[in-house]
């Protein structure tokens, strides 16, 4: 079986139905998303969910960059020429990592403040 016949009957029906919705949307000059959501409330909820997903990605990016920066600084300070005693980093290295993490969290907090201001 090849082509559309390899799909189960319910999938073929869904593809046919979505194709009809797409054709109806194209023929009336509306966008595909607008034709899929007949109610404006549904469309605004869809946009809201997409915005929330983007916010989560941005927050993850800020947090990950702070962690990467902290790890890089920690690894630089843990080089053999900087080691004090038996494989221990100088006490300043731990403070620096903590300070970098705090800076990263401050960036996240600033991002959230800007976000709440833009939502008002």
Curated annotation (Swiss-Prot):
Task: Glycosylated residues: list them.
Answer: 71
The UniProt record lists the keyword Cytoplasm:
no
Q: Output a single Gene Ontology CC term carried by this record.
A: extracellular region
Residues annotated as signal peptide: 1-29
- The keyword Hydrolase is annotated on this UniProt entry: no
The listed location of motif RxLR-dEER is 57-77
Q: Where are its TM segments located?
A: none
Report keywords, A-Z.
Glycoprotein, Host cytoplasm, Host nucleus, Secreted, Signal, Virulence
Q: Which compartments is it annotated to reside in? A: Secreted; Host cytoplasm; Host nucleus
Q: What induces it?
A: Expression is up-regulated in spores.
Top-rank taxon: Eukaryota
Q: Which family does it belong to?
A: Belongs to the RxLR effector family.
Q: What the record says about its domains?
A: The RxLR-dEER motif acts to carry the protein into the host cell cytoplasm through binding to cell surface phosphatidylinositol-3-phosphate.
Q: What does this protein do?
A: Secreted effector that does not suppress pattern-triggered immunity (PTI) in plant host.
**Name of the molecule in the record:** Secreted RxLR effector protein RXLR-C26
